[in-house]
Amino acid sequence: GCGGVDSYDLDMTVDGRGSKGALHLYNKFHMEHPSNMFVLEYASRPPLAKIFYEDVLMSAVFYGYPILIENNKYGIARHFESRGYDGYLMARPDHLKSANTKINVKTKGIPSNSQDVIQAHAHAIEAYVHNHVGINRETGEVGRMYFNKTLEDWIGFDINNRTKFDLTISAGLALLA
């Protein structure tokens, strides 16, 4: 399995609202275990970003899943590194590397402002919904998506205004991972 995180770096925002941090963990295909399904949804904004980072770290360690982060918000990466768990942070997946991607990039995660990544993210969710949510009309199989908040987030998702859609961002990152 693997995970995706939509993180934040500031403890509090000016207006006190701010977006939540979000984490999804996903079981990839496996012959013996439930696969192609999300197994964890977490969305919260604790008073300190460090608390969110630690919650994500504990989830990654408990499940043994590496996670994909947005590399423009690096507080979570610093937290994992300071605790000695940077091995749980994924590098940019090969299928998301473009010709412009440097070969030896040391930064973990992927850029959330890259148009290639934004498009791949939207396509990953679209494909997942088509193949694993509801009834697959071609096979007759019933998909398993147990997290209603994520489903609602997907319904309202606006690719041109992604700020409010924390669950969509983290779920998409998990699928890209």
Where are these regions (language model features)?
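RNase H-like, metal-dependent nuclease domains and their acidic two-metal-ion catalytic environment used
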Residues: 1-92, 131-177
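Short alpha-helix plus adjacent loop in nuclease-associated cores
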Residues: 89-134
